[in-house]
Amino acid sequence: MVAMSEALVHARITLLQAWLRMLLFSSVWPPTWCAEYKGPPETVKPLRVIVSSKDMSLAGWMSYSLYFGGQRHIISMKSKNFLESRQLPVFTYNDQGVLFEDRPFVQNDCYYLGFVDGDLESMAALTTCFGGFQGILQINDTAYEIKPKSPSSTFEHLLYKIDSEKTQLRPMRCGLTDEEIAGQVRLQENGKSTRMQSIYGSWWSHGLYIKLALVIDHEQYLYRKKNTSLVIRDVLSIMQGINLFLLSVDINVVLLGLTIWTNGNPIPVQDIYALLPAFCTWKGTNLDSQIPYDIAHLFVNYTFSNYFGIAYVGTVCDKTFGCGIDSIAEDDFLTIGHIVAHEIGHNLGMSHDGILCTCGEESCLMSATMDSSQKLSNCSYEVLWAHMINKSCIHREPRPSDIFQLKVCGNGIVEEGEQCDCGSSENCRRNRCCMPSCTLRSKAKCDTGLCCNRKCQIQPSGTLCRARENECDLPEWCNGTSHECPEDLFVQDGTSCPGDGYCYEKRCNSHDVHCQRVFGQLAMKASDSCYKELNTRGDRFGNCGFINNEYVRCEISDILCGRIQCDKVGTLPILQNHYTIHWTHFNSVSCWSTDYHLGMKIADLGDIKDGTNCGPQHVCIARKCVNKPSWVNDCTPETCNMKGVCNNKQHCHCDVGWSPPNCQETGTGGSIDSGSPGNEVYEDEVVSKKDAPEKPNVIIWLLPIICVAVVLSVLFCLSGATKKSREAAASQPAEERVKPPYEGAEPSYETVKPPDEWANP
């Protein structure tokens, strides 16, 4: 359901985007031109609807009901974030030209994209950043603008029907010509521009990430009356438009930084053809050291005759030429979303559409002239398919190291100088351990951590804080002084585990276990002939990895280390999107496998894991079958007195009854890394107790005596009660002894109030 819903969202690139382009910015800039409406607005009241699909609810979808046009419509939408951090880095200059960096808090979870249930061509683009819903709906080829009604105490909104015939766009064209493209090619060749190569192959429909750096010129800063907050607000509205325009190819544009020329333009901006190389040079000197990015664009409040922008073609991962210019002047404010999406298309390698290019409308996104259509043509798709495999930067999500986190009390992250951080004021009111000042409450010893209990106290030493997950994992216990559980440790790589497997990185890996994880408990490793037949092909169903964007055929000695091949598959599993199950039958042998192609953002279920047994004293490492003795470890079972196992730090984890560090003396078990359990023996302990020294247990001897005493006491009490009952019965008249219990009396009934939620089914 989620996949279907998201696919529908990605497919709905229709005329709504033109209206969104017009109306997104009319709320943040004083419009010199606006959409025309058909008649007066309707008053609507959005009502929250409980999502019936559990998958959609978990995926972050929410639904609202709106009644207009004589019928009820259900709007399903999902938040679209285009900032990697709420603390967006913003660079400005003072009067002396000194660069300053600020990290203002930016609300980024109030922009939504979605659709209207029951209409495959519908689309919704809404924001709640400014109170209520504001944005565009398209239903049955009709566009509507929605905005909060003011004043209103009942969440009322006004819904306007847009008159598409009266709403027109000003004719403009892109500054990129055939001659300009030829000059760009010569410039890049002369400059020996480095094109980052990628190992990503079939990226299609698995998402691209463009990390964008934006620069705002001085005229736009003055136009916003030197108010950086308004400039940031403008940029966020533009970002929503850009992402909507590029949804059809699953391109995510992420803003990593913003620079505002607050002290004048450092380069002339009047000539668009001179400005493009000048800006690229400026950014190389001034921007590269500030933030990481894939492309940088300059927003200029200047009219370049009839040109709306220009960019270098195919330079999205090129640090020298990865840039573009976008005009945001005068009545072109309402077209900025289209402009930036168009110029980013050039950065991605798309040229202007020719006469053979089509998208089902009169013109497409990459038309040389400005138009209302935002669909990509067949020519643009061909460019993406052919050239994006060589752009490694856009296949990677932004790294955590690229994201700055402002150290401040109240962000929910415990940082230097803080005892705790309960986050928002609402969370702090519910928190019994931490105060809004990021200090612990009176008598509280801790706030978070697996060794901090509900009373804000540190758990006693020996309290189990992390149970083992499997036979290759180890448990950890609190040490009594820290609120944190010790580091998550596991059994040393190379240790034998069930199924003729070996522990490796906390997993017991074997072909049978692997098949069961993918195809169910009845599945098992297929015949070696399957591995030989398929893994030597070198395709997405059988290979030994990738080199230079090509599948690698397995050598005969490595066939058991390529892709998993299974047999005895009773039922087909329900797998994530983009997986394909492959079945081959030859020479009375069945082989089941899954595919994986480069660019998929989900884990590969079918690659054989390191540590899997591939022969006597051989294991798979990096798709090669190597000798097991390649694991050289200082810790062995003999090191642990044969009373424990070695952990991944090559220290002994002792059995219950023996004490670390070497399991030579009696104790409670554990290790110097994981801690030790208390006197109580935990069922989650990983090792066997059979070798623990025997100790006399007094309780075992006392249990029979206690049981006999309890039984005798119960029998004595029962005999006394029976005797008294007989004496009382003998003293009653005969007629009373035979009277039915409810004779002459009305039975009583208890009235039970149903739960509140039953009142309104």
From Swiss-Prot:
According to the UniProt entry, its GO molecular function terms are:
integrin binding; metal ion binding; metalloendopeptidase activity; metallopeptidase activity
How the cofactor is bound: the record states: Binds 1 zinc ion per subunit.
Q: What does the record say about PTM? A: The prodomain is removed during sperm passage through the caput epididymis after the protein has reached the cell surface. Not processed in the secretory pathway.
Q: Where does the EGF-like domain lie?
A: 631-664
* Positions of short motif Cysteine switch: 172-179
Q: Which residues form the propeptide?
A: 35-200
- Tissue expression per record: Expressed exclusively in testis and more specifically on the surface of mature sperm (at protein level).
Q: Which residues are listed as membrane-spanning?
A: 698-718
Q: Name one GO biological process term.
A: spermatogenesis
Q: What does this protein do?
A: Plasma membrane protease present on mature sperm that may be involved in sperm function during epididymal maturation and/or fertilization.
Q: What is this protein called?
A: Disintegrin and metalloproteinase domain-containing protein 24
The organism named in the record is Mus musculus (Mouse)
